[in-house]
A protein has these predicted regions:
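N-terminal pre-transmembrane cytosolic regions of membrane proteins
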Residues: 1-60, 110, 119-127
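Short, surface-exposed charged micro-motifs
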Residues: 65-67, 94-96, 200-202
Length: 348
């Protein structure tokens, strides 16, 4: 836990035990930055500052939705900044604030263990560095909070820019026909969409919070303008995220159209192939019918000749005077009859 006083001459670090005396000062802004909300921090929040137990509990637990609680002498906010994780997952980096008359308490909410703890401190570290270098001298707790939250809004905007570059690359791959594995490409599209939706939600909720704070009459002089400025920053991030989301939706729809056309072309090619195979099968059947018909025609004379060639002892037909011509005529008649039948059935 860092206990700091910020005044015209710079920034100074103090012990936690000095907090009750420091809060009595009117010539400085008291800034308490809590990287991890442990038991000691909870005791300070509840015991020294006397914050509401629900607000203290929110600091100790992970909150997935931004919120604001307005109390008579201070304001409590829960904000989020995005951090891109592996495989397109978006981590919610939480920043809680208690903004009072002459103090600001920043609490960095619990984060996923896979996220570098330094990521949660980037906004407060950046503002601390500006104060230490003499580039920034906040005159009130609201001015100090404005600087920190503005850094958070810029991080949201930077996240949108990163996702936007990914969207442009995805569009180029779609229009260039270089999508590779379709399933993997679809996953990339929806990871980008997930990122834009996540940061859009963060910005929209944060903008609504600061829009509400800008309308409070209890905010000190100049504080309302600072709150309104932050609300505008979040609204701008939301608008940019909305625009990129619509742009990405166009890329997704175009890719779906490409997939549909490709599927139709493949189906058409398959239909042509099936038609070709059907025609080949039909032609083959026609040839088989012709072969079968001619085989039947030639089989009839062969049958008669086979009967006469049996050479049994008792075959009266062998001794008929007209046996031979009768056999020839019968062979001819059978052949002609079969030919006529097959011809009528269009087998020949």
């Amino acid at each position: 836990m860092d206990v700091l006083t910020v005044c015209d001459v710079g920034i100074e670090r103090h012990d936690v035990a000095e907090l009750p005396q420091l809060l009595e000062r009117q010539d400085a802004v008291i800034w308490v930055d809590i990287p991890v909300c442990d038991e000691v921090s909870i005791d300070v929040l509840a015991g020294v500052f006397g914050f509401h137990r629900i607000a203290v509990r929110d600091c100790a637990e992970r909150n997935h939705v931004s919120k604001v609680h307005i109390y008579p002498d201070h304001v409590f906010t829960v904000l989020h900044a995005p951090q891109l994780g592996k495989r397109g997952h978006v981590h919610y980096i939480e920043l809680d604030q208690f903004i009072g008359r002459n103090y600001l308490v920043t609490v960095h909410g619990p984060i996923n263990p896979v996220v570098d703890p330094e990521v949660a401190l980037r906004e407060t570290r950046a503002v601390h560095a500006r104060i230490a270098a003499g580039r920034f001298r906040p005159g009130s707790a609201f001015e100090l909070s404005h600087a920190i939250v503005s850094a958070l809004a810029r991080n949201q905007e930077t996240f949108v820019e990163v996702v936007t570059r990914d969207v442009w690359q995805l569009e180029q791959r779609v229009t260039g026909g270089d999508v590779g594995d379709p399933e993997g490409f679809i996953n990339e599209l929806f990871r980008a969409r997930h990122g834009l939706l996540a940061v859009r939600t963060m910005a929209a909720l944060s903008g609504a919070i600061y829009g509400r704070l800008a309308g409070l009459t209890r905010i000190p002089t100049g504080g309302q303008a600072l709150m309104a400025d932050i609300a505008d920053q979040f609204d701008r991030v939301r608008a940019v995220a909305d625009g990129e989301k619509e742009y990405l939706q166009g890329v997704i729809e175009f890719y779906q159209t490409v997939l549909t056309i490709n599927a139709a072309l493949v189906g058409q090619a398959q239909n042509v192939e099936v038609q070709r195979l059907t025609e080949a099968s039909y032609a083959q059947n026609e040839e088989i019918k012709k072969i079968s018909a001619w085989a039947a025609i030639f089989f009839a004379p062969t049958l008669i000749g086979t009967i006469y060639g049996m050479n049994f002892d008792h075959m009266p037909e062998l001794h008929w005077a007209f046996g031979y011509p009768s056999a020839l005529i019968l062979m001819l008649l059978l052949s002609v009859a079969l030919y006529v039948i097959f011809k009528r059935r269009r087998w020949l």
